[in-house]
Amino acid sequence: MASGTTTTAVKIGIIGGTGLDDPEILEGRTEKYVDTPFGKPSDALILGKIKNVDCVLLARHGRQHTIMPSKVNYQANIWALKEEGCTHVIVTTACGSLREEIQPGDIVIIDQFIDRTTMRPQSFYDGSHSCARGVCHIPMAEPFCPKTREVLIETAKKLGLRCHSKGTMVTIEGPRFSSRAESFMFRTWGADVINMTTVPEVVLAKEAGICYASIAMATDYDCWKEHEEAVSVDRVLKTLKENANKAKSLLLTTIPQIGSTEWSETLHNLKNMAQFSVLLPRH
């Protein structure tokens, strides 16, 4: 991993999921309420620093957790972070494990997704906003930023965390949990973990030309595992409370590493990909 003097300034957006959105991780915090062409984001942006790296924290479900997954304004959230100058977005998300080896309390640095959502806008280029003209066909073969993932994986190893270096996330619409038949089906599809928020967040970040990576915290075994209690809200919150410090320490240690790494080529490539994926109207 290259380090040294950075020629490209970075700013890290942090989207905190259920139980993983503690603003105390930021030094010198200030709040900023913003609006976007797509409406208001989930909550105020919390601006601050982590070891001299500029960061912007946003609670995905609102600070009081009042927004269900289907109603999160993913477009506004990503747009607001982009407008604030974020080059990277690192998110935390609770998830269910679909694999024996991914135990509750483990971290997964996911590298792929399967989309089972049905109600969510997945593009800024929806034809109704002058700020995003045209139609965007963004490539998603590699949805998550490999370089950011590598920094997260290396840091997790140094911290001695139980961390899985890859995994496929299936995102369901929610807010209900899966039936047992669905849970079995997702396992046969090759999914490793399950949540309700990765899509469309990762897609919109790619359209915005942002380096996006996700820290997924396994809280349960969903409902496929025999002789194991099925997922419930109480169980998810209990596991998060016991293990949230792992995600916190990973963020606090990773972000200075990102701040000392050269990103100009990565960001240039992402910007070009986003730009050249848009088909503009013919005149």
From Swiss-Prot:
EC number(s) reported in the record: 2.4.2.28
EC primary class: transferase
Provide one Gene Ontology biological process annotation. Answer: L-methionine salvage from methylthioadenosine
pH-related activity info reads: Optimum pH is 7.2-7.6.
Q: Which residues bind substrate?
A: M196, D220, Y221, D222
Pathway field of the UniProt record reads:
Amino-acid biosynthesis; L-methionine biosynthesis via salvage pathway; S-methyl-5-thio-alpha-D-ribose 1-phosphate from S-methyl-5'-thioadenosine (phosphorylase route): step 1/1
What are the annotated GO cellular component locations? Answer: cytosol; extracellular exosome; nucleoplasm
Alphabetized SUPFAM superfamilies for the sequence: Purine and uridine phosphorylases
Residue(s) carrying N6-acetyllysine: K51
Q: Where is this site: Important for substrate specificity?
A: S178, V233
Spell out the reaction equation it catalyses. Answer: S-methyl-5'-thioadenosine + phosphate = 5-(methylsulfanyl)-alpha-D-ribose 1-phosphate + adenine
Please give the activity regulation comment for this entry. Inhibited by 5'-methylthiotubercin and 5'-chloroformycin.
Query: InterPro entries given for it?
Result: MTAP, Nucleoside_phosphorylase_d, Nucleoside_phosphorylase_sf, Purine_phosphorylase-2_CS
Q: Which GO terms describe its molecular function?
A: 1,4-alpha-oligoglucan phosphorylase activity; S-methyl-5-thioadenosine phosphorylase activity
Q: Which superkingdom heads the taxonomic lineage of this protein's source?
A: Eukaryota
Task: Kindly state which keywords UniProt assigns to this record, in alphabetical order.
Answer: Acetylation, Cytoplasm, Glycosyltransferase, Nucleus, Purine salvage, Transferase
Signal peptide limits: none
Query: Subunit info?
Result: Homotrimer.
Implicated in which disease? Diaphyseal medullary stenosis with malignant fibrous histiocytoma: An autosomal dominant bone dysplasia characterized by pathologic fractures due to abnormal cortical growth and diaphyseal medullary stenosis. The fractures heal poorly, and there is progressive bowing of the lower extremities. Some patients show a limb-girdle myopathy, with muscle weakness and atrophy. Approximately 35% of affected individuals develop an aggressive form of bone sarcoma consistent with malignant fibrous histiocytoma or osteosarcoma.
Q: What does this protein do?
A: Catalyzes the reversible phosphorylation of S-methyl-5'-thioadenosine (MTA) to adenine and 5-methylthioribose-1-phosphate. Involved in the breakdown of MTA, a major by-product of polyamine biosynthesis. Responsible for the first step in the methionine salvage pathway after MTA has been generated from S-adenosylmethionine. Has broad substrate specificity with 6-aminopurine nucleosides as preferred substrates.
Q: Per its record, how is this protein called by name?
A: S-methyl-5'-thioadenosine phosphorylase
| Organism, scientific name | Homo sapiens
